[in-house]
C-alpha cells in the first residue's frame, strides 16, 4: 500500500526487495523496480548493497529479519533514502525493542542512536471482527517522529514510555491501538467484548471506556429517575 501511494503521489525511483513478490506495481508517477529474493538476489544484505548502486529514492525491504539487514537498512536511511519495511511485532514498543535486540549488547547503543536519528515512524495493524459480522476492520497504532518519540527510541530507559508518547501525540497523528479501538467501539463498528480482547491493556481500555461515559447503542443511562 505504501509503495502504491508513493507511486501515485510523486516521481522518483522506488526499488523493492521482496520474498516473494506479492503485488506487481505498474509505473505511474514513479518508476518501480521489483527484485525477488531467490530469483534476482541471494540475500537481503547483498540486495541492499546492489540497490544503492541503482540510485533509488525509496527502498522497500519486504521484512527485517536479522542484524545484517537492519544494519543495511539503517545505512540506506542515513544516506538520505526513504526505507520502508515490515516486521512481525505486536506494537510500536515491541518493534523498537526487536530492532535493537537483533544486535549484540555492545552494538545496541549505536543502533539505538541510529534509530533515534532515522526512524520516521511506525505503523502497526491488527484485524478484529466487525460488530455487524461483515468481515474485519483494521485497527492501527501509529508512532510519528517528534522529539519525545525519537528520545524514547534512542534511550533504553524511556522505550517503555512509547505507549504514553503515542497516546499523548494525537496532535501529530499518533495513536495507540487502544485509542483506535475506543473510537471504533464508540462508532459501533466493534463491540466492547471484541475490543477488550484485542486491546493491548484490557484493564486500561476498560478505564478509558468508563471515562468517556460510553454506553451501548440503544441503552438508557440510569440517572435515578423512574
Regions found by a protein language model. Name each.
Residues 1-226:
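Short, flexible helix-loop junctions that flank or precede catalytic/ligand sites
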Amino acid at each position: 500500500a505504501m509503495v502504491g501511494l508513493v507511486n501515485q503521489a510523486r516521481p522518483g525511483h522506488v526499488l523493492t526487495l521482496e520474498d516473494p513478490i506479492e503485488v506487481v506495481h505498474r509505473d505511474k508517477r514513479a518508476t518501480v523496480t521489483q527484485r525477488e529474493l531467490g530469483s534476482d538476489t541471494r540475500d537481503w544484505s547483498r540486495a541492499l548493497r546492489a540497490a544503492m548502486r541503482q540510485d533509488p529514492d525509496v527502498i522497500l525491504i519486504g521484512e527485517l529479519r536479522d542484524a545484517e539487514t537492519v544494519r543495511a537498512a539503517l545505512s540506506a536511511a542515513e544516506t538520505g533514502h526513504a526505507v520502508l519495511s515490515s516486521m512481525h511485532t505486536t506494537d510500536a514498543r515491541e518493534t523498537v525493542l526487536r530492532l535493537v535486540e537483533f544486535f549484540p549488547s555492545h552494538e545496541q547503543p549505536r543502533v539505538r542512536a541510529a534509530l533515534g536519528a532515522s526512524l520516521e515512524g511506525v505503523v502497526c495493524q491488527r484485524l478484529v471482527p466487525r460488530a455487524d459480522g461483515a468481515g474485519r476492520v483494521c485497527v492501527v497504532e501509529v508512532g510519528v517522529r517528534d522529539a519525545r518519540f525519537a528520545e524514547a527510541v534512542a534511550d533504553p530507559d524511556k522505550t517503555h514510555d512509547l505507549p504514553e508518547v503515542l497516546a499523548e501525540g494525537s496532535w501529530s497523528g499518533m495513536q495507540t491501538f487502544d485509542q483506535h479501538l475506543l473510537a471504533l467501539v464508540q462508532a459501533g463498528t466493534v463491540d466492547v467484548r471484541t475490543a477488550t480482547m484485542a486491546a493491548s491493556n484490557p484493564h486500561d481500555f476498560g478505564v478509558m471506556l468508563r471515562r468517556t461515559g460510553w454506553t451501548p447503542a440503544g441503552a438508557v443511562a440510569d440517572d435515578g429517575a423512574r
